[in-house]
A protein has these predicted regions:
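Predominantly extracytoplasmic/ectodomain segments of secreted and cell-surface proteins
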Residues: 1-134
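Beta-propeller fold detector
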Residues: 115-125, 167-179, 212-225, 273-281, ...
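Beta-propeller domains
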Residues: 118-124, 139-177
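Structural signature of eukaryotic scaffold interfaces centered on beta-propeller domains
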Residues: 128-146, 180-195, 225-250, 284-301, ...
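Structural motif
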Residues: 152-163, 198-211, 245-269, 301, ...
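N-terminal export/ancillary region detector
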Residues: 274, 282-292, 320, 328-330, ...
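Blade-level signature of beta-propeller repeat domains, shared across WD40, Kelch, NHL, RCC1
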Residues: 385-442
């Protein structure tokens, strides 16, 4: 025949995939044709080494054929299992029998247990805060970079950039304009500013953490005029939520009017809307910690705990969707969170967690109502205690105790990289993070 056939010189891998790994999950692989590399951006779980040591490449799309090894052995991806604990090289042969391309295939596996909470002690403050008088809070600058502020009094603070969370560099800050008798524990971060209520009912704010000015309450909207509105405490913030009509971040406070306490909200710290209902006696009034939880309906809820005026056997969180109407999250069962001094709540890694008290036990909850001791891997840092047996032949007893036990007063905040920062009254600082929240892609 006079027909001439021209065979393709295409020696590229068009698609690549592995057999499912754990729990039937199919991991996506990236093909870099320039570098001739194939890899997974989202690393496989810890322990996958025992699966990928003998696994099938179930997707390998080429126009020609593939060989492997020094001998260029013909490779059949549907029957030839491979060991991908180390990178391997596959050679693609084009149909023209001349053109070839080699691809390096790398399977990335997490080396850390994703469910472990890992703690690290950081650079201490240059001086210890006064007893029961310190507050840690995060403030973003104009470039949206986070700074960790620790207020040790109403005239002094320390600041460190969190640009490199592995390293703290403390700068002493002179604080001006903050009233001398302000409760530092009630400072709230809102719209890249810090706000606090003064005992005389005024609100003070700062955009740099050092210079504070009177925010100036201008108006209160509700059923009747408030002659002399006094802000008792600033509680928390609401996140913008289209489902509930919250158009922008909103500040929540409690104001005093005629001897009664009412909730109030503001989008600027000056103009406020007051609730109709008074505040329950069981609602937290001091050292409030807040977190944001998106419920099953997709609605954002602000959830708070703190010191209450009444004593109780349990720590009961309260939640709101609009800042004006609140409900407690008490449980009729025995699965309540035991009462603890100065509790801190966080919605973190898909669960609620409660820290505080003597810092021996963390309590966890799926929706904030029924509580249990946290998972074995989600603990405070522990120290090993070895007690010798009474007699020579008796085995020694090994127990573990929280390094935070009875460390005393503290303040806690969480940054955008999911680091939990705890500042202690002796000036020591610890940083913790759940491993999986540090992985690049979930």
């Amino acid at each position: 025949s006079d027909d001439n056939y021209e065979y393709s010189s295409d020696a590229t891998i068009r698609a690549f995939g592995l057999d499912t790994i754990k729990k039937g999950i199919y991991y996506k692989f990236t093909i870099d044709q320039l570098k001739r590399e194939i890899y997974n951006v989202d690393s496989l779980p810890v322990g996958s080494d025992t699966i990928i040591d003998k696994i099938l490449i179930d997707t390998l799309n080429v126009t020609g054929w593939v060989t492997s090894g020094l001998q260029d052995t013909l490779f059949n991806n549907l029957t030839d299992s491979v060991d991908l604990r180390e990178p391997i090289t596959l050679k693609v042969h084009a149909a023209d029998r001349v053109t070839t391309r080699e691809y390096k295939i790398t399977v990335n596996v997490h080396k850390q247990d994703p469910d472990s909470l890992i703690w690290r002690e950081m650079s201490s403050l240059p001086t210890s805060p006064a007893a029961n008088k310190q507050k840690s809070v995060i403030l973003k600058n104009d470039a949206e970079e986070e700074n960790l502020f620790v207020y040790t009094s109403t005239t002094s603070a320390y600041r460190s950039s969190l640009g490199n969370p592995a390293y703290l560099s403390w700068n002493a800050i002179e604080v001006t304009g903050m009233p001398a008798n302000v409760d530092l524990g009630s400072i709230v971060s809102f719209k890249n500013q810090l706000f606090v209520a003064a005992p005389n009912g005024d609100i003070f704010c700062s955009n740099n953490g050092s210079t504070w000015v009177n925010a100036g309450i201008q108006e209160v909207k509700e059923n009747k005029e408030v002659q002399n509105m006094q802000m008792s405490i600033l509680v928390a913030t609401l996140k913008a939520d289209a489902l509930t009509g919250i158009s922008e971040e909103t500040l929540i406070g409690i104001l005093l009017d005629g001897g009664q306490k009412y909730f109030c909200i503001s989008t600027d710290g000056k103009n406020w809307t007051r609730s109709k209902e008074t505040v329950s006696n069981d609602f937290p009034v001091k050292d409030i910690y807040a977190t944001v939880f998106t419920n099953a309906s997709g609605i954002k809820q602000t959830v708070v705990v703190g010191k209450t005026e009444t004593s109780a056997k349990a720590v009961v969180p309260w939640f709101t969707m609009d800042g004006l109407t609140w409900a407690d999250m008490s449980t009729p069962s025995d699965f309540y969170c035991p009462a603890m001094e100065n509790p801190a709540i966080m919605y973190y890694g898909g669960l609620f967690h409660m820290m505080g008290g003597k810092f021996e036990t963390i309590y966890s909850s799926r929706v904030g109502i029924a509580w249990n001791e946290s998972a074995e891997k989600f603990k405070y840092p522990m120290k090993k205690i070895v007690t010798p047996g009474e007699d020579e032949d008796d085995e020694e007893e090994v127990t573990y105790e929280s390094l935070f036990k009875d460390k005393g007063d503290y303040s806690l905040t969480i940054d955008k990289n999911h680091y939990i920062w705890i500042v202690w009254n002796d000036g020591s600082i610890w940083r913790g993070r759940l491993n999986k929240l540090g992985f690049k892609i979930q």
